[in-house]
Amino acid sequence: MFIDSVKITLASGDGGKGAVSFRREKHVPLGGPDGGDGGNGGDIIFVCDNNTHTLVNFKGKRELRAQNGAGGMGRNKNGKKGENLELIVPEGTQVIDAQTNEILLDLTKEGQRELFLKGGKGGLGNTHFKHATNQRPDYAQPGIKGESRLVRLELKLIADVGLVGFPNVGKSTLISVVSNAKPEIANYEFTTLTPKLGLVDVNEYNSFVMADIPGIIEGASGGKGLGLAFLKHIERTSFLLFVLDPMRQMPLKEQFIVLRKELEKFSNELFGRKFGIMISKSDSVRLGEEFAEQIALNINELDNYLKEINNPQSFLIKVSSLEKTGLKELKFMLLEEIKTLRNNKKNLTI
């Protein structure tokens, strides 16, 4: 089950209370204080793990709490620290304050560890309160309460290439033939109900991650169809590949315009992101000469439109996933784009 959003209360452990204790030894009827300190409460720690792909482990849980620190004991024995609670989450998980929507943590790298809530400090035992005017203090500190916070965990998939298109245009078929992903494929809309990641091996030394995002429909940015629930996953993709279907009644140019408008409404940054265009189901041109001519006119109209607008488009290619034509060229084109983006990012961090 793919779960990409959960609301949960997280709480670090309370500090253990300090002990009130006195030495009890033979021949020492009024021994001094020997109460140990309470242990600190356990911390809440987030750990990013790329072997985890969903937030399903948090589903149905209202609260997760780290262990409380143990109380202090006599003979100056300190209480044990409460065990930390480590929360394993996928790459791309954001921890958001459920009330203010402030992003508190952004976990994007394998092995990333972030202390989120510190456990409460253990109370001091009565040993600390002995002084000249009070040799037998009968007071010890209570432990300090741990922290608590209501948060929303949001998963935004991280991929090099995000597939953008209407439902049933061939995105799932494409990712199934170029990568190790095995999405459900059927001839009806919204076959893909959850995002899928696939590793695309271009050659022995180069690969990239592709994300199959559930189909977008007009009005998706306002919540129609699968709407906002999955548009957010496109935010973490470096490069967009628009998949356009020549078999749809809507012309290719109109498909592209509608898809781009939905991205623009959702995020201005997405609208300006670099992209390529793939015309899917190119084998369909075999259905007749007249249909082939119509598709050619469609593609020409789209090409002219792209030249008219100021856009970051890098290529336009025809592909048949069924006949496996154009796939090799597509993979190399995408790899070159990803390499360029990676190098640019690397230069920015130097």
From Swiss-Prot:
One of its GO terms (cellular component) is cytoplasm. Its EC number is 3.6.5.-. Residues 1-158 form the Obg domain. Its cofactor is Mg(2+). It holds the Pfam family GTP1_OBG. PROSITE patterns: G_OBG (PS51710), GTP1_OBG (PS00905), OBG (PS51883). GO terms for molecular function: GTP binding; GTPase activity; magnesium ion binding. This is GTPase Obg. It comes from Campylobacter jejuni subsp. jejuni serotype O:2 (strain ATCC 700819 / NCTC 11168).
